[in-house]
Amino acid sequence: MKTFVIGDIHGCYTALLAVVDAAGITPEDCLITLGDYIDRGPEVRQVVEWLLDWQQTGQLIPLLGNHELMMQASRKDTQSYQFWLACGGEDTLRAYTPENEEMCLDYFPEEHWKFIENDCHQWHETATHIFVHASLHPGLPLERQYEQVLFWDRCLLHPPHHSGKIMICGHTPQAEGIPANYGHAICLDTGVYLEGGWLTCLDVASGKYWQANQSGDTRSCQLGDPRPS
């Protein structure tokens, strides 16, 4: 069994299918997803439905992203709702709202809410790595991490975690669509929803990664090598 991790998907279902196929991920492999499944891309509903289906393998470890947090907060007050819309929430509403109907959260299925609110984790830890959406406070154990750091800070804002484990995160889009390897931290957000962006999937043990875009193009490389092909 291999362990794969996929960066911010942002409603890009076409790229998701292509990168899973390129990496050869099977239902027997452990698959960690780093959050931000919604907003900004055109296929949010298909992404969430795919995650729900893959969850049936028992090998999916989905993390929360700041965009899921914003959507949850948007149910509570108008200000939070408007903030979420400004950060890409309209793309999510558009994906769920029937044609010719006014866009609203009422069309978001209860099963999808349960997935985000009950099944997605704040972090995941192994013997060698810590997986998180955004970053880690270096001096705090995982159970005492601040929400601001876990979901909003940039990956290089903090020094290495006191555990000595490598952090694998998303959230901070990397230039030219190439994942960043800083030794103590690896960032896999390669801006799939942006022009020229890619979705990245990493084999944690080997350091090989695969990428796909919304046109279905794929490429691969080794962490630390100059450029994928």
Give the predicted meaning of each segment.
Residues 125, 131-133, 201-205:
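Short, well-ordered beta-strand micro-motif
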Residues 8, 36, 65-66, 92, ...:
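Divalent metal-coordination and catalytic microenvironments
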Residues 40-121, 153-154:
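Active-site neighborhood of divalent metal-dependent phosphoester bond hydrolases
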